[in-house]
Amino acid sequence: MENAVWSVIKYTPKHGCSDEFKMALERLAEIMNKPDLTWSLIELDTGEIVQISRIPSIDAIVEGQIAGLEWLDSVDHLLEKDEEGSRTQAYSGLELDAPHSFQVKN
């Protein structure tokens, strides 16, 4: 069985654009609405939004990549960019099958 992939993506809405960005997250929710995806959004006290996703495989990531990038392009004007021009701060990696993981069923 292929390991699942976890992804953590942080978005920083521009000042005054937070409400519009949150409304745009509804379109992202439609893209992410797949039975095999687990994901959630949290809002930090800094106003940043963090998307945490568990995707069942690398193939599933590739499958949704175009729709995800199109969504990100559609909200580009609402997001702060870092000094290199990136709209997000993102991390991803393969899920470890560890005994303490909440994914392990007893």
Give a label for each model feature.
Residues 10-23:
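Short, surface-exposed ligand-recognition loops at beta-strand->loop->(often short) alpha-helix junctions
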Residues 40-46:
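A short beta-turn/loop motif at secondary-structure boundaries
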Residues 4-11, 50-52:
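Active-site-flanking beta-strand signature of metal-NTP-handling nucleotidyl enzymes
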Residues 2-4, 44:
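Short coil/turn motifs at beta-sheet boundaries
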Residues 89-106:
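Short, low-order "capping/linker" segments at domain edges
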Residues 13, 44, 94-96:
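A compositional/biophysical signature of low hydrophobicity enriched in polar/charged and small residues
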Residues 13-15, 55-57, 106:
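Non-catalytic surface loops within mature trypsin-like serine protease
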